Regions:
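Ligand-site clamp/hinge motif
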Residues: 217, 225-270
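Periplasmic-binding protein-like
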Residues: 293, 297-338, 355-356, 391
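N-terminal lobe/hinge region of extracytoplasmic solute-binding protein
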Residues: 35-85, 204
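Extracytoplasmic/peripheral linker and loop segments enriched in polar/acidic and small residues
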Residues: 154, 351, 408-415, 437-468
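Ligand/substrate-recognition segments at binding pockets and active sites
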Residues: 216, 360-429
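Gly/Pro-rich hinge or "lid" segments in bacterial periplasmic/extracellular proteins
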Residues: 165-233, 237, 247
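Surface-exposed binding/hinge segments that line
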Residues: 126-187
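Structural transition elements
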Residues: 324-366, 384-388
């Protein structure tokens, strides 16, 4: 529909759909070595939200349900689940044979405590319990400080976990696989105080592995023999290395020091077609976000001209070399959106295009109108991912191609999207729906970059949020 055409011209999206992974044959080994470009920010499941931290937590933690190797949801700590006719109440029966690494049983109360604790902390991760995510009854009020955590719509009945939602949403079952929904042993956590999750001694595991050692650059996990599926686990030890550059990942892989790494860039090309590499689907969007309070970026004609200058198809060929696809809108390909389960990209006839000649003509007219020699903008980004700087460099080159725009690059630890003129936003959806990709534009969710459109907000609330 026309609304999407309007939004797409405002946010200059380019989609990076896949990542190249290198895998050595570790089947016959008892130790698995993994390299990550990021660093762990926290091993506290109530706080962690970044990919690196959640990857580690998912190795030593477990949830009600989990995805298997075929990406199908299967019972984990929950033995079974029932849903009410109105889709708003979930009842989970907890397995009796699940134990913490100290021998304590994992109970339904552990989930209640964990969820209330996260919301009481008002962490970024706890937002997944609110209407931004799972829509648990009362979560919004608790997160916003209007009510106490005791009012959360979750309780224990006959040793079963009962969860009441504010409204029916299919996202709930996807989200319970995330660490913030994992159980916590209240007695143990409170005994550790502020030191909880800072060392192996201040952590408990209910998952396949338990943390053996922790440093900034490396975490070692060993098999949790008390785990209910310990006998099905072939790997005894996992070494996770952090802060590893693309070049060092490839070097370590070639030397046999690691068994798995995700890589991008020029050096990844030599693995094309080899059995040791695979292009893994990963629904990530990189958005070039304009600030709608800016004098010039608030002009749709300026934004549309900038969009015409982005050579999206060359970002894989010249920058990433990982099988990424160019964007055709705000959503990655293969993301379900409408009630008929039709992919939004298939449902839309709108296509982003590259037209340097048309962009130059438009910019000439605009520069004359604004009495400027050049448009000048600063593009702000964080270097959390190996590809970010290279993508920012390519955007700069694209936008400066007609010599009518000057772009300065600014690397920061955290982007203030409301202050930055242009910013680079990476979005990886938690679920296979449109919600996470469109929520940043919705005023009632994040409303970044001062974007405000009543038509979009109404559509997001009634169509996207309601059907997610």
């Amino acid at each position: 529909m026309s609304l999407f055409k309007k939004i797409v011209t405002l946010v200059l999206a380019m989609s990076l759909m896949t990542g190249c992974s290198l895998t050595n044959n570790a089947d016959s080994q008892k130790v698995f070595n993994f390299a990550d470009s990021g660093y762990v920010t926290s091993l506290d499941a109530s706080k962690a939200i970044d990919e690196t931290s959640t990857n580690v937590i998912q190795a030593f933690g477990d949830g009600l349900y989990a995805y298997n190797v075929k990406s199908k949801l299967k019972p984990a700590i929950a033995k079974s689940m029932k849903v009410s006719d109105d889709g708003k109440t979930y009842t989970f029966e907890i397995r009796k044979n699940v134990k913490w690494s100290n021998g304590d049983p994992v109970t339904a109360e552990d989930f209640v405590y964990a969820w209330k604790r996260a919301l009481s902390m008002r962490s970024d991760a706890s937002k997944l319990l609110t209407s931004y995510g799972a829509a648990i009854a009362g979560a919004d009020e608790i997160y916003n400080g209007r009510k106490s955590a005791d009012t959360l719509g979750v309780y224990v009945k006959d040793k079963k976990l009962v969860v009441n939602l504010a409204y029916k949403t299919s996202r709930f079952m996807d989200l319970v696989t995330q660490p913030v929904f994992f159980p916590l042993n209240q007695k143990f956590v409170e005994a550790q105080g502020d030191q909880y999750a800072t060392s192996p001694k201040t952590l408990l595991s209910c998952g396949t592995y338990k943390v053996s050692s922790i440093s900034k650059d490396k975490i070692t996990l060993k098999k949790n023999k008390k785990c209910y599926i310990a006998k099905k686990t072939n790997i005894d030890c996992i070494n996770m290395y952090f802060g590893i550059s693309n070049e060092d990942k490839i070097k370590m892989f070639d030397e046999g020091k690691i068994d798995f790494a995700a890589v991008t860039g020029e050096n990844a090309k030599k693995y094309d077609g080899k059995d040791s590499s695979t292009a893994d689907p990963d629904s990530v969007i990189w958005d070039l976000v304009p600030n709608f309070k800016d004098q010039y970026l608030s002009d749709a004609r300026v934004r549309e001209a900038m969009s015409l200058l982005l050579e999206r198809k060359k970002y894989n060929k010249q920058v990433l070399h990982d099988g990424s696809h160019k964007a055709q809108g705000l959503l990655p390909m293969g993301i379900c959106f409408n009630s008929n389960k039709q992919f939004i990209r298939d449902a839309s006839s709108y296509k982003l295009k590259y037209d340097k000649k048309e962009a130059k003509k438009t910019l000439s007219k605009l520069l004359n109108e604004y009495k400027l020699k050049k448009f000048t903008f600063t593009l702000t980004y964080t270097n959390d991912y190996p590809a970010t700087k290279a993508i920012a460099d390519k955007i700069k080159d694209d936008l400066e191609a007609t010599k009518q725009i000057k772009v300065y690059l600014k690397e920061v630890n955290t982007v203030d999207y409301n202050q930055a003129e242009l910013s680079l936003l990476r979005i990886k959806g938690v679920c296979n729906d449109a919600y996470d990709y469109l929520a940043p534009l919705a005023v009632n969710n994040q409303g970044i970059n001062h974007y405000a459109n009543n038509e979009f907000n109404n559509y997001f609330r009634t169509e996207v949020n309601a059907k997610a």
